[in-house]
Structure formats: C-alpha cells, structure tokens
C-alpha cells in the first residue's frame, strides 16, 4: 500500500466515531475512547485429522480472504476417539492488525455480510464481558475473493474483533457505529 493511503473505515473512525463515543460516554482522557485492536480469523478443519490435504484448502481460502499467510494450528494432545495425534494440523488462524485489519472489516461489513442468504443481522449477545465480539460464518463463499467454482467444500470460520473497550456496552456501541448489523 502506498504511504499516504488510509483505509476508509479507519478515517471514519478517527473523524466521526471517536467524537460520537466521547460525547456518549464522556471520557476524561482521549486515550480511553475504545478502538479496534485486532481481528482474529480462525478456521477449524477437524477433517484434517483424517485427510492432511484438507488443511491446504483452508490455508488458501484464508490467504485469499485476509491477504496474509495463516498460521497452522496443531493439536495440543492426542485424542483416540477423534483419531487425533499430538502435532497434527487441525486449523488455521490469521491475526490482522493495522491497515489490513481496517480493510478486512470494511470488506466484511460492506460486501461479505450482505451476500449471506437470509441474513437478519448479527446477534449482539456474543460479547465476552470485556468488549470483544466473536461471531461465526457458516461458509467462505460470501467473500468475493473466493472463486466459488474452485471451492472443494464449504468451510466455516470464527471471527473475533478485539477492542480496547472496558465493557460490553462500550464495545457494542463502537461496533454499531462502525457499521456492524446487529439484530
């Protein structure tokens, strides 16, 4: 990215959303205004325990969606019932920060979520008590970076938006201002 480019959602956060949050919660210090710290995209591939090629599809999908190479997550311990051995790859994870995070959130909110069939909004009950929000997507085809013809099987993913908010009320207000479509 060029050095003078700023993602549009980041610009909106700095110019409009920070002021709105400060007016509502009346912070004493501007550093108390909540912001988005990072976004973690996790794709669990339990079938990779039986077929090690399954993880490659998840890695390619996550790379296309986020623009960043995923980290392979391995099993911490062996579980005989799941035919799982310690060290086997069972998932992939990407942590987005900075401009890549703002670009991903912008694409998620404006392009990907509206493409979900029968989408009625995200639940606003999935906050963790500290202002962080986690939600799941059932398949990866809603992202336009994924070529639907090349998808071997639908894979879901978990997306966690980590904020610097101290409680759920502040986190909910921040994400609603950013454009998250809560029910």
From Swiss-Prot:
- GO cellular component terms? ribonucleoprotein complex; ribosome
Instruction: Name any Gene Ontology BP term.
Output: translation
Q: Which InterPro entries match?
A: Ribosomal_uL5, Ribosomal_uL5_bac-type, Ribosomal_uL5_C, Ribosomal_uL5_dom_sf, Ribosomal_uL5_N
MF terms from GO for this chain are:
rRNA binding; structural constituent of ribosome; tRNA binding
Superkingdom, according to UniProt? Bacteria
| Pfam families (alphabetical) | Ribosomal_L5, Ribosomal_L5_C
Q: Which UniProt keywords apply?
A: Ribonucleoprotein, Ribosomal protein, RNA-binding, rRNA-binding, tRNA-binding
Q: Which family does it belong to?
A: Belongs to the universal ribosomal protein uL5 family.
What NCBIfam families does this protein map onto? PRK00010.1
Which function does this protein serve?
Answer: This is one of the proteins that bind and probably mediate the attachment of the 5S RNA into the large ribosomal subunit, where it forms part of the central protuberance. In the 70S ribosome it contacts protein S13 of the 30S subunit (bridge B1b), connecting the 2 subunits; this bridge is implicated in subunit movement. Contacts the P site tRNA; the 5S rRNA and some of its associated proteins might help stabilize positioning of ribosome-bound tRNAs.
Q: How does it assemble?
A: Part of the 50S ribosomal subunit; part of the 5S rRNA/L5/L18/L25 subcomplex. Contacts the 5S rRNA and the P site tRNA. Forms a bridge to the 30S subunit in the 70S ribosome.
- Please give the name of this protein: Large ribosomal subunit protein uL5
Q: Which gene encodes it?
A: rplE
């Amino acid at each position: 990215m060029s050095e003078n480019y700023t993602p549009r959602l980041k610009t909106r956060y700095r110019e409009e959303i920070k002021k709105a949050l400060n007016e509502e919660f009346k912070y004493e210090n501007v550093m108390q205004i909540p912001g988005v710290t990072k976004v973690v995209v996790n794709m669990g591939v339990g079938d990779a325990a039986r077929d090690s090629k399954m993880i490659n599809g998840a890695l390619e999908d996550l790379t296309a969606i986020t623009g960043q190479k995923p980290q392979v997550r391995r099993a911490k311990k062996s579980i005989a019932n799941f035919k799982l051995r310690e060290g086997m790859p069972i998932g992939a994870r990407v942590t987005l920060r900075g401009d890549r995070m703002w670009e991903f959130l912008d694409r998620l909110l404006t392009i990907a979520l509206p493409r979900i069939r029968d989408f009625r909004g995200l639940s606003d009950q999935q906050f963790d008590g500290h202002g962080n929000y986690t939600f799941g997507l059932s398949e990866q085809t809603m992202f336009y970076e994924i070529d639907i013809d090349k998808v071997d099987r639908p894979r879901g993913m978990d997306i966690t938006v980590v904020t610097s908010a101290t409680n759920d009320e502040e986190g909910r207000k921040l994400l609603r201002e950013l454009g998250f479509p809560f029910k």
